[in-house]
Regions:
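Active-site microenvironments in enzyme catalytic cores
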Residues: 2-106
Length: 106
């Protein structure tokens, strides 16, 4: 992916987050997307979140189970960031319908 496409995709993801709308999977529109592209998009997406005041408070790792990796067609875990806007305090409650799009648990 070229830099413009990476920036455009990150902006689209950021807009969909703010508007709480579902978008077509990136792999459907960009079948050539690879892990390098994904991490570049993630870094740009984080920059957009930081530009509106979010702060990085941690890192995350996902897709650690071989069963989940097989289900998703990948062969390694993925790594990402956590911002203060993603924080949910212990024992607090929130509405899944109002907060999450296609929630999943590993």
């Amino acid at each position: 992916m070229n830099l413009q496409t990476i920036n455009d995709v990150a902006s689209e993801l950021f807009d969909s987050l703010k508007q709480q709308k579902i978008i077509q999977p990136l792999t459907d529109r960009y079948p050539e997307i690879d892990i390098k592209d994904a991490y570049q998009i993630s870094r740009q997406f984080l920059s957009l979140r930081e530009a509106v005041g979010e702060k990085v408070i941690g890192k995350k790792i996902g897709v650690t189970s071989s069963v989940v990796q097989e289900m998703l067609g990948v062969d390694q875990p993925d790594f990402g960031f956590l911002t203060d806007a993603m924080r949910v305090q212990n024992r607090s409650t929130f509405s899944i319908e109002d907060s999450l799009i296609q929630p999943r648990a590993e």
